[in-house]
Amino acid sequence: MFDAKKFLADVSHEPGVYRMYDDKDQVIYVGKAKDLKKRLSSYFRKNLSSKKTEALVASIHHIDTMLTSSETEALLLEHNFIKLYQPRYNVLLRDDKSYPFILLTKERHPRITSYRGSKKFAGEYFGPYPHAGAVRETLSLLQKLFPVRQCENSVYSNRSRPCLQYQIGRCSAPCVQGYVSDEEYNQQVELARLFLQGKDQQVLDYLIGKMEQASRNLDFEQAARYRDQIQAVRSVIEKQFVSNERLDDMDIMSIAYQHGLACVQVMFIRQGKVLGNRSYFPKVPANTDLSELTETFVGQFYLQGHQGRSIPNSIIVDRQLAEKSELEQLLTEQAGRKVTIQESVKGDKSKYLQLAQVNAKAALNVQLKQSSRMSERYQALCDLLNLPEIKRMECFDISHTMGNQTVASCVVFNQEGPLKSDYRRFNIEGITGGDDYAAMEQALQKRYERDLEEDKIPDIIFIDGGKGQLNRALNVFQHLQVKWDKNRPHLIGVAKGVDRRAGQEVLIISKQDREIHLPDDSLALHLIQHIRDESHNHAISGHRKKRQKAFTQSGLETIEGVGAKRRQALLKYLGGLQGVKKATLDEIASVPGISLKLAETIFETLKND
């Protein structure tokens, strides 16, 4: 029993962070306070504010505290601890990915490309966009409007004639001399920049002026090209929502909550344009107040993400926040400029907020229906296997091409569906090419030879294959020397049936020593097919990446003494890989950073390749 009175006697009145632990020494809640003693004392009053707090207090075994120099510092530390410990009584944002940007590079002939990560390359960044699909859509649109290159520099610097993009009018071919002047190309780059900044009218005014000038000069062919470009830009603008207000960069957030599930809808607006929206489904403890949920989400969303998750000038929410000023101060410090959180808005901002609310409710309804279907399928599988409960399932598959670049995948499902953060791939090495049995054995060893936490032990492991694959898996588990309960998982083989068609799968249950043929309409079969297909796709995508990497390797990677900088120098000065292969020993030695001895090694290696 936790002695609250004894603990509180030594707690300071300073600002800080506290961590609450259960009897298994697991952090179950992280909080922060302007006055630690006052805040922690509130947990041990007779009349607690909610059932959630009652359940939390009943689980406390011990508490530790950490003093901070300010409440703002405590707020930042709180979010860092939440990310680290993932406590079950905190609201948890289950998305920590960076967001993609569009990058306009700073070069003689700039290119437009998608980019994700820290902003380390010279150029202008536009975004963030809610997902990669929104970036691809925008890049495709830009290609149709402005013939600016999107190719990699390795392609651009080694062209002797224009590529297909020039032939279909989506690039002006700056890579080949004589097709477009630097001035003409940079004009199109500037138009693309203005368009990405939301300055559509400036783009139209410029193009109209150029069209009229071409007409006056009797250059009707050029005037027609400008006319077509004007029509294309106008067509795009007409499809966009046009605000009468001058809108700042902002994110708009709305929350919908029903049956224990919450959806946070975020709309991204930059330079007055809606870049897109995205739905988030944070893990919410029972009886959590929606204002607390909003507050926690805002903090985690901007303070726990990667550098790609930029902070806008203003954040609009549909709930009153108790710690609004503290959040604003912290976000301002993080962004290096003033950031405001608005709880009451008018005009177009209000329309956007209403739109976010509608989308949040719609996304929540879809998620509730999917969760209901997933729950039904889980129950059907439990009934089929005579199991009281299934919390976690894992499935393995193998992918290769003629025995080369073999990759194994492991996908994970919990009661809510795919748990993509726990997906893994394994590079399979040291086996006979095409030996799927050995590949599966190696994948299982890599996955399960290490220590597993209690909640990471799967209840079911699906093996994509028949009895042979399943027997190899059983052999691996028989010889495992681990601390966790290796007998807990049920190993199940999923054979494809006689005709290898969907719906004819045969389940081979190792512990029950039986085979099950399921009807096409079986909910349990649908769940198994979902898991198996997910594993198959994950394995194939990993194999393709590995195969593409092997295909694009220059051969220089394997030469000792040739790192990334020297490789780039060789390719740059000798005109690509073919230029390096055709170069003489003296030509290789003339490249900056390449000694005569290293040049001899490179020359001999490529000659014998």
Swiss-Prot record:
It is found in: Cytoplasm. GO terms for molecular function: DNA binding; excinuclease ABC activity. PROSITE patterns: GIY_YIG (PS50164), UVR (PS50151), UVRC (PS50165). GO terms for biological process: nucleotide-excision repair; SOS response. Residues 201-236 form the UVR domain. Residues 13-91 form the GIY-YIG domain. One of its GO terms (cellular component) is excinuclease repair complex. It holds the Pfam family UVR. Keywords: Cytoplasm, DNA damage, DNA excision, DNA repair, Excision nuclease, SOS response. SMART domains: GIYc (SM00465), HhH1 (SM00278). Belongs to the UvrC family. The UvrABC repair system catalyzes the recognition and processing of DNA lesions. UvrC both incises the 5' and 3' sides of the lesion. The N-terminal half is responsible for the 3' incision and the C-terminal half is responsible for the 5' incision. Interacts with UvrB in an incision complex. HAMAP family: UvrC. This is UvrABC system protein C. It comes from Haemophilus influenzae (strain 86-028NP). The lineage of its organism: Bacteria, Pseudomonadati, Pseudomonadota, Gammaproteobacteria, Pasteurellales.
